[in-house]
Amino acid sequence: LDTNGNTVDIGVSDLYSTTCNTTTAIYQAGSSVSDYTGPVVPFALSVPAASTQVSISAEAAHAVFGLSGKSSTLGGTWKDATPWTDPTYYFIRNSSSGSTVLSAVMFNVPKTKFWGIDRLSTDNLRDSMLATTEAEASIGILSIVDADVNRGNLRSLYLQSPGQISGYLPDSNKNSFDKMNVRDGHYPLWGYEHFFTPIGAGGVPSDAAKAFVTRFTIARLDQHLLDNIIAASLVPQCAMKVTRSAADMGNFSTNKGLQCGCYFDEKTAGKTDCTPCGSSSDCPSDHSACNYGYCEIN
């Protein structure tokens, strides 16, 4: 912002305010600023395609990003987190970025204590990983937006979250784009896209802000917008089977809102087992809602 001041209609974040600042919120939600949640943004722990590594656990990620991957940092009680033992090849963002903050919560590492080099921007992080000459030693935390479009050169790791007995990709397999494990809660490294808007005395945002956030936060999204969200590797809330609050990354609730999982499957996998429909009269009683051309429960 310049010194003359600008009118800010919307701020965008991957985080709840209380996740970003766990001790005190900068504002009281609903008093001077409103938080509108949009689509889901998954993140991936990624390695160069030439790496032989395919998986990582949250505990191993703690050893890497919290302890530099070396047993000596732990007093010699664990084995080194080979091959990730040189923080020079940890590709991260700063302590206020969504990728770092969400990972810090899951890996139990203070967000200001991450080992690695801040690559200053998301684009720079991605490009630095693509250019690395040390494929086996390199690991980074990427938005799925960048991970998906670079699958030929970067590989997302199976992530075993705390309490799980196996690891999961964001998708059902390495070749798909269905975000199935994000949508059903098996892969919890994700955040909502948040739109923060100042609100006036009447408790409503400016006309400009309202015109924007309404498009993303109404239950039934415009189909053109829905298509663009899906094409960007994001997950619209209507395609999620689970929801969660700011309190706990793994504390999921069933999504009882309007559903578009059938349409999402058709767009990402080219097929769906759902019943097509032109109106609700075409749908059976147990899937009575006709949403985006398919019968859904809600």
Task: For every predicted segment, state its role.
Residues 1-298:
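Flexible loop/hinge segments at secondary-structure junctions
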